[in-house]
Amino acid sequence: MQTYGNPNVTYAWYAGNSGTTNRSGKFIAAHAAHAGLMMFWAGAFTLFELARYDSSIPMGNQNLICLPHLAGLGIGGVSNGVITEPYGCTVIAVLHLIFSGVLGAGGLLHSMRYEGDLGNYPEGSRAKKFDFEWDDPDRLTFILGHHLIFLGLGNIQFVEWARIHGIYDSAQGITRTVNYNLDLGMIWNHQADFLTINSLEDVMGGHAFLAFFLIIGGAFHIATKQYGQYTEFKGKGLLSAESVLSYSLAGVAYCAFVAAFWCATNTTIYPTDLYGEVLSLKFEFAPYFVDTADLPADAHTARAWLSNVHFYLGFFFLQGHLWHALRGMGFDFKRVGKAFDNMESAKITAG
């Protein structure tokens, strides 16, 4: 984290990232605990939605978040937008709760039992391989490579799920198997207009290509080392805890904005019988999405909730990116407050 030349800097209690800055073991503990919290939310909220789900009302008009996603994956015996076999959703929810406990225990184990700094482990040990310094591009890209490979495997799992089990097709109102369309021309052309994609086969083709791309990229980052000018290309002299955090926040903000507009306008990936009608973009104090369907007062579709929440979370993540990017570049925000204090205390004298 940025210290502005002060070797004995202290951080406030709310600066949570500072606790893992130079302690790679604590960093892993925080990751595991965070994943456990997300798992717990998903499981608990799915059970909450199941308890209030009414099959006589369109799913998109019931302010649901988790159930439409599960239905879109073909879980719950969905037919014409109605869940007919909620047992499958219950199983998924309970599994998430169980795994959340496992991940939470892993976070506590890494935090309380194992070394806070993986660098304290013997040379050549598996734990030592994942120790890192924030300004070491070799070790950071080694870890990045593993992340990319697991993301690629996740894409493969999704593609195979659609091919073998099937996903929900709103055009037919049933769950059907979907084979991927690995048309590179289609994938290239959808780089700019992916919001308009209207074929599940094309969606799966994009994920299949992305899986290949991610795994190749992961292997590349694991295998390559610093060499000549490539050292600077990997970020030598640019990397720090603050800068890596800013890059991550920028990526999350981008994903949130894409999800917001995709959910608001696309009915292939976000079917109307699961999420409600498409939205309209309005501008007042700030941009926001509004429902186009006739709904009771103060009622909103699942599409409206998802799109607006993603949009505003993306906005605040973007502000966090700018904040940490400027700090990583050396800008001291305390100077802003000092400048205002100097303006208030300045005396104007007649010439």
From Swiss-Prot:
Induction behaviour: This transcript is expressed at a very low level between 4.5 and 72 umol blue light/m2/s. The whole antenna complex is most highly expressed under low light; as the light levels increase antenna complex levels decrease. Thus at least in this strain the amount of antenna complex is controlled mostly at a post-transcriptional level. The transcript is also strongly induced in response to iron-starvation.
Main location class: membrane
TM spans (from-to): 27-47, 64-84, 89-109, 203-223, 244-264, 306-326
Cofactor: divinyl chlorophyll a; divinyl chlorophyll b
Membrane topology reported for the UniProt record: Multi-pass membrane protein
Pfam families in UniProt: PSII
InterPro entries found in the cross-reference section: PS_antenna-like, PS_II_antenna-like_sf
Annotated localization: Cellular thylakoid membrane
GO biological process, one term: photosynthetic electron transport chain
GO CC annotations on file: photosystem I; photosystem II; plasma membrane-derived thylakoid membrane
Keywords annotated in UniProt: Chlorophyll, Chromophore, Membrane, Photosynthesis, Photosystem I, Photosystem II, Thylakoid, Transmembrane, Transmembrane helix
Molecular function GO labels: chlorophyll binding
Note: This low-light-adapted strain contains 8 pcb genes.
NCBIfam families: PS_antenn_a_b
Subunit structure as annotated in this protein's UniProt entry: The antenna complex consists of divinyl chlorophylls (a and b) and divinyl chlorophyll a/b binding proteins and binds more divinyl chlorophyll b than does the antenna complex from high-light-adapted Prochlorococcus.
Family that this chain belongs to: Belongs to the PsbB/PsbC family. IsiA/Pcb subfamily.
Described purpose of this protein according to its UniProt entry: The antenna complex functions as a light receptor, it captures and delivers excitation energy to photosystems II and I. The Prochlorales pcb genes are not related to higher plant LHCs.
Name of the featured protein: Divinyl chlorophyll a/b light-harvesting protein PcbC
Originating species: Prochlorococcus marinus (strain SARG / CCMP1375 / SS120)
Lineage, broadest ranks: Bacteria, Bacillati, Cyanobacteriota, Cyanophyceae, Synechococcales
Name of the gene: pcbC
